[in-house]
Amino acid sequence: MSKPEFVYVTYIETTPEKLWHALTDGNFTERYWFGARLRSDWKVGSSFEMVRSDGTVSDAGKVVEVDPPRRLAYTFKNLSDKYKNEFPALATFVLEPYGKLVKLTLTHEGFEEGSQFYSGISKGWPAILSSLKSLLETGKPLKIPYAALKFEN
């Protein structure tokens, strides 16, 4: 049986440079990522952390690939007890310009069969990337109620 993989594709009216900034600048990520600030120097081999609004680090991993403004890849896993037996998975962002649009493809892979983390990111990524698209195109992120994501406790 093959390991699960999550792929999400969207088209955003922006430039590759603005989208790259939106994916890598912690001040910007907290505007569309449920208040989370991504923290890294974005060099291959460097640490990656997701810092919540209360200052706690909820997710951590390593930067794997950096090719601005075309490709970004990092591993990460959620640090909560719920996911303590899970391995870090690889998230890869590919940015392809098409005129006034950028095609953003996110592939998140490396999950074990039955992964609870895979189940969680499958609900989270569509909301995060929809809010990112809205913010870049309209200047306002979406206000998606956490309950709409239907995460299990």
Identify the residue ranges that each predicted region occupies.
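Intrinsic-disorder/low-complexity, polar/charged segments enriched in Ser/Thr/Lys/Arg/Asp/Glu/Gln
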Residues: K3-V9, S47, S58, R71, ...
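Short beta-edge strand/loop motif at the mouth of beta-sheet-based domains
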Residues: V7-Y8, T14, N27-A60, K150-N153
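Hydrophobic/aromatic beta-strand elements that line small-molecule binding cavities or substrate pockets
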Residues: T10, A60-E65, A89-E96
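A short, structured loop/turn motif at beta-sheet edges
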Residues: P16-E17, V64-R70, V94-K103
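Hydrophobic pocket/interface hotspot
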Residues: L19-W20, T29, F48, V63, ...
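Short beta-strand segments that buttress and anchor functional surface loops
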Residues: S47-S53, Y74-L79, H108
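Beta-strand/loop substructures that line and gate deep hydrophobic ligand-binding cavities in soluble
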Residues: S80-P126, S134, P145
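Short, highly charged C-terminal tails/helix-capping segments
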Residues: S134-N153
